[in-house]
Structures are given as C-alpha cells and as structure tokens.
Amino acid sequence: MPCRTRKRLNHVIPVFAEWDATYFLTICCIPRGMNTLCRTERAIEIFQSVQFYESLGKWSVRVMLLMPDHLHALVDFPFWGDMSRIVGDWKRYLNNQLEIRLQPNFFDHRLRRDESHDEKWKYVKMNPVRAGLVKNAEDWPYVYQSPGTR
C-alpha cells in the first residue's frame, strides 16, 4: 500500500503554551498495515529506549501504547526541550538501531488545562479493543507506563 503524503506539521511549541504541558503524540510506521511494533522483544527494546531518554531528561513519557503499525503516547517535554528535535532523534534511533522505519512526520496535540489526561488515556487504551486485537483493554501487553502514573 503506498504511503500517503501528509501535510507537514509545525511542531514548535508556541511561546504562550504552558511549559509543563502534556502532548498527545501519534507516530506511524512505514509501511502501514504490518505488525512492526507488537512483538515482545521489539516492545521491550522500544520501552528501554523510552526509559533511556527519560534518564537523560529529554522527556517524561506518562504512557505509551504500541499498536502493530503505530504508537500513541502522552509525553511531557522539559521547558528547554525542542519537541521536534527530541522526537526526531528518538525516531532516528529506532530506525538506525532497531530497524524500525517510521513516517517522517508525526502528529502532536497539546492537551489544554481543561482536557483530562485520564480521558485521553482511556480513549487511547481502547484502540486495541476497537481494532479487534483484544476483548479487554487491560489484556493488551504493549503498554509502557511511567512509574508514578496511574
């Protein structure tokens, strides 16, 4: 299936945005429609790279859910962090070290103060259920949850 060309998004965090905002990210694999991410060893490697970036202070991933050909995450970036660069560097690592090909761009949405992190996470964790991969969201094994996140 050919890869759709999408409009390039500007991932610069606006100056008026709260420095402690949480971002909802979606990153898609190339090609779509194949199980690239949902294998136990692969998921472990991805989640280890998430933890490594956390240890460097580049981001704090509240939760990440892997689907076969894309991932969703709720992420906090440091006030000095360049989201586009941080995500781009991580995607390059996944490509170069784990041979995971990802689309050049990604989707991000800054959660406003009135948006509930819990509501967004409840929606995301139902993805495997909606896709018919599991009957119960709690049965999906490809989830990373940062310590201290409920």
Which residues make up each language-model segment?
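Short catalytic/metal-binding and nucleic-acid-binding patches
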Residues: 1-150
